[in-house]
Amino acid sequence: MRLLGLDVGSKTIGVAVSDPLGITAQAVMTIPIDEDRHNFGMRSLKKLVREYEANGFVLGLPKNMDGTAGRSVSRSKAMGERLEQKFGLPVYYDDERLTTVASERILVEEAGMHDRRQRKEVVDQMAAVLILQNYLDLQRKE
């Protein structure tokens, strides 16, 4: 089962894809969005669903550190509903607490990306990888 992992933000969506066996996640791209113009990246996502023959989506659920729903939870849930309606594929959610912080740390410490502008281009993709990989790991444990 091949899944697309999404890190949904206010201006971009980071995208990752699982391998066909559902073991590893790899970064794919960052899709610009414009909520004010109702551009939610569906055209790009449609191409990715076809290209990777995706069977579903995993979206990050931005909870607060105490486990309560963060302000952006409604954005992720609304995107999940749009995806279900548009593609008819299942949408799963995974706790995304600290994925952006972890992504920044990985990019600086392991990839040597000290330029903030350079990191900005890939941090959403890395967050999507962490969201999807966490989901895949949890599924294998069950």
Swiss-Prot record:
Listed InterPro entries: RNaseH-like_sf, YqgF, YqgF/RNaseH-like_dom, YqgF/RNaseH-like_dom_sf
Main location: cytoplasm
Gene Ontology MF: a single term: nuclease activity
Subcellular location: Cytoplasm
Known function: Could be a nuclease involved in processing of the 5'-end of pre-16S rRNA.
NCBIfam families the record matches: RNAse_H_YqgF (TIGR00250)
Record's protein name: Putative pre-16S rRNA nuclease
Lineage per the UniProt record: Bacteria, Bacillati, Bacillota, Bacilli, Lactobacillales
